[in-house]
A protein has these predicted regions:
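A short, flexible beta-alpha/helix-coil linker loop
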Residues: 10-11, 85-87, 124-127
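Conserved active-site and cofactor/substrate-binding residues in soluble primary-metabolism enzymes
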Residues: 17, 21, 46, 95-101, ...
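Short alpha-helix boundary/capping segments
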Residues: 10, 14, 91, 95, ...
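Helix-loop-strand module that forms the ligand-binding subsite of alpha/beta enzymes
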Residues: 67-116
Length: 199
């Protein structure tokens, strides 16, 4: 089985970039292995519908993004099956959040959507243009990390922590795609680092 860990968001709008920052953070600090499955990490930016042919190649998908949840404080972490979203999740946050919902719904109608999990956090600031994360979202990163690692471990993955790079250290370079579609396919990543594909 091929699993795609997909970070979604606009890094130029503060907390809206958490999906991209988080996937870069996991890629930087962990090594994953499984006797049967493959894990690929991808910085999806704000492409949404443009990712459809990529997503369709996988049997499982984990989307990391901000989520809008009625009545919830900023920094609340959610990890749920897309088919059974909590009732307070209304998908009415940023434009790319709405478009990602439309993309997954369209893929479901076409029969191309893989089993989808969503790892999300409610944002504090998504405008004006700011590069960085607010304190509440930064504090949510360890909770998101634990949720993801626990999930993968239950699926039989060996999750080895190989670094201790803070997410804030990765943000200044986040406008440069570290895990792009082309890099994933060709194996040629910027700064001499290959996107993580584990079989």
């Amino acid at each position: 089985m091929k699993i795609l860990l997909l970070g979604i968001g606009n890094v130029l709008y503060a907390d809206e970039g958490i999906g991209v920052h988080f996937v870069n953070y996991i890629h930087e600090n962990y090594q994953f292995s499984h006797p049967e499955h493959q894990l690929v990490m991808l910085d999806g930016g704000t492409l949404a519908q443009g990712l459809t042919p990529i997503i369709a190649q996988y049997q499982a998908l984990i989307v990391v993004d901000t989520v809008n949840a009625a009545g919830c404080e900023p920094g609340e972490v959610y990890f749920f099956d897309f088919d059974n979203a909590p009732p307070e999740i209304d998908w009415q946050g940023s434009a790319h959040e709405v478009e990602m919902l439309q993309t997954l719904t369209m893929m479901e109608m076409m029969g191309d959507r893989p089993h989808t999990m969503v790892l999300g956090v409610t944002p504090t600031v998504i405008e004006p243009m700011t590069l960085g994360l607010t304190e509440r979202i930064s504090a949510a990163v360890p909770v998101m990390e634990k949720a993801l690692i626990n999930y993968l471990t239950k699926l039989g993955w060996q999750c080895e922590k190989i670094g201790n790079t803070d997410i804030a250290e990765l943000i200044p370079q986040s406008y440069i795609p570290r895990l792009s579609m082309g890099d994933r396919d060709s194996g040629n990543a910027p700064q001499g680092k290959e996107p993580q594909e584990t079989e």
